[in-house]
């Protein structure tokens, strides 16, 4: 049926690492789908979806510094034995750390979806509605196990990670982006005009939680199988934008071109009185190749345009999610002195913020 087209594809990638000792691998699964449907003569729908999952698994000791591992490995003697006479791994070989020093696992899921409708109810008028949604989830697990070397009498001593530990990190973000706009074009004689106007918004939220504990008790490295108090943390961040936009295009016989754009954007990153701003742009052009005096040269140069433009676009990106809030620095047990046998919590004065901060 010409009114309905669909497409589905999948992919699997399994990539082994470079290490002979200790698994070092990456696996990726992807699925993509698309549907185009002509619902009526004047209404068309398009739906796109894409999902991917990536799994990374590597020795936990590499997380302490992959560059350091390869740096040291390249500087050892190539004839260095890997085991001692008793069959134990030599610390200089790094094999014991790779095989028994813990694991680092990372799983990331990404789902992106897009739904759009295009309507042409009357000649020259096009109505567009787009909805974009993206979600990202990530989970990291790392554990560092104590590894040992052995002296000449076969007595063990700590080689790495004197205190075993578990670290876990969970992250999730959501992004939502609706776009609604209309276009109208009309020609009369050699005059051609096109007008476009619409609304756009972005909505972003993210959250993460971290936890770490020391002293793994069993062969199952989890937060519940440790002996110390947990060290936990987390954050929640968000921002939102909204904007109205419009554009006018005009040309005369395809020779003289003019375009004007105007945006009115607002961002949650600024105070209410500085949140909104106008951003105009203009351009004018001359298509010389459309002039009659250029016809003898058309076989040699069929396109030649002169164009001049000026415009502004706003930038809300900063290194601070909420730059207009004065925040107090806080550190748990950050003091360098003892009160009742324990380090106290500390706080610092907030930095200066600008009440006039706005779009760049």
Label every model-predicted segment.
Residues 1-59, 70, 111-114:
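Transmembrane beta-barrel wall of Gram-negative outer-membrane proteins
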Residues 13, 65-96:
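Acidic, glycine-rich flexible loop segments
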Residues 24-25, 61-63, 297-302:
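Short, glycine-/polar-rich solvent-exposed loops and beta-turns at beta-strand/coil boundaries
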Residues 34-43, 48-53, 89-144, 156-360:
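Extracellular/periplasmic, surface-exposed regions of secreted and cell-surface proteins
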Residues 62, 68, 358:
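Glycine- and other small-residue-rich loops at beta-strand/loop junctions that grip anionic moieties
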Residues 64-65, 326:
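Short, hinge-like loop/turn segments at secondary-structure boundaries
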Residues 77-80, 150-151, 159, 259:
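Core alpha/beta catalytic barrel or barrel-like domain that forms the active/cofactor pocket
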Residues 149-152, 267:
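Extracytoplasmic gating/loop element in the C-terminal half of outer-membrane beta-barrel translocons
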């Amino acid at each position: 049926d010409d009114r309905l087209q669909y497409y589905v594809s999948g992919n699997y990638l399994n990539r082994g690492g470079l290490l002979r000792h200790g698994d070092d691998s990456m696996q990726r699964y992807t699925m993509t789908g698309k549907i185009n449907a002509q619902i009526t003569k004047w209404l068309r729908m398009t739906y796109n979806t894409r999902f991917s999952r990536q799994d990374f698994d590597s020795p936990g000791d590499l997380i302490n510094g992959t560059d350091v591992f390869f740096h040291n490995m390249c500087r050892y003697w190539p004839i260095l034995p890997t085991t001692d006479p008793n069959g134990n791994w030599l610390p200089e070989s790094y094999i014991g750390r790779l095989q028994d020093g813990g694991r680092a696992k990372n799983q990331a899921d990404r789902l992106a979806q897009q739904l759009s409708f295009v309507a042409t109810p009357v000649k020259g008028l096009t109505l567009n509605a787009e909805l974009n949604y993206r979600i990202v989830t990530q989970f990291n697990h790392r554990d560092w196990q104590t590894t040992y070397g052995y002296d000449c009498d076969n007595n063990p001593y700590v080689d790495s990670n004197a205190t075993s530990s578990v670290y876990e990190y969970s992250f999730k973000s959501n992004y939502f982006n609706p776009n609604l706009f209309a276009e109208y074009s009309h020609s009369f004689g050699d005059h051609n005009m096109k007008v476009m106007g619409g609304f756009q918004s972005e909505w972003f939220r993210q959250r993460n939680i971290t936890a770490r504990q020391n002293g793994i008790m069993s062969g199952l490295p989890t937060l519940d199988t440790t002996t110390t108090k947990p060290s936990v943390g987390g954050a929640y961040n968000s921002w939102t934008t909204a904007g109205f936009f419009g554009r006018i295009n005009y040309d005369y016989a395809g020779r003289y071109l003019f375009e004007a754009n105007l945006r009115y954007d607002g961002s949650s990153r600024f105070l209410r009185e500085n949140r909104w701003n106008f951003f105009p742009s203009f351009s004018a052009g001359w298509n010389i190749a459309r002039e009659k005096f250029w016809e003898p040269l058309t076989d040699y140069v069929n396109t030649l345009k002169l164009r001049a433009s000026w415009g502004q676009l706003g930038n809300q990106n900063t290194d601070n999610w909420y730059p207009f809030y004065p925040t107090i620095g806080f550190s748990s047990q950050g003091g360098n002195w003892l009160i009742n046998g324990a380090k106290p919590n500390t706080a610092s004065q907030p930095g200066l913020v600008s009440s006039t901060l706005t779009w760049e």
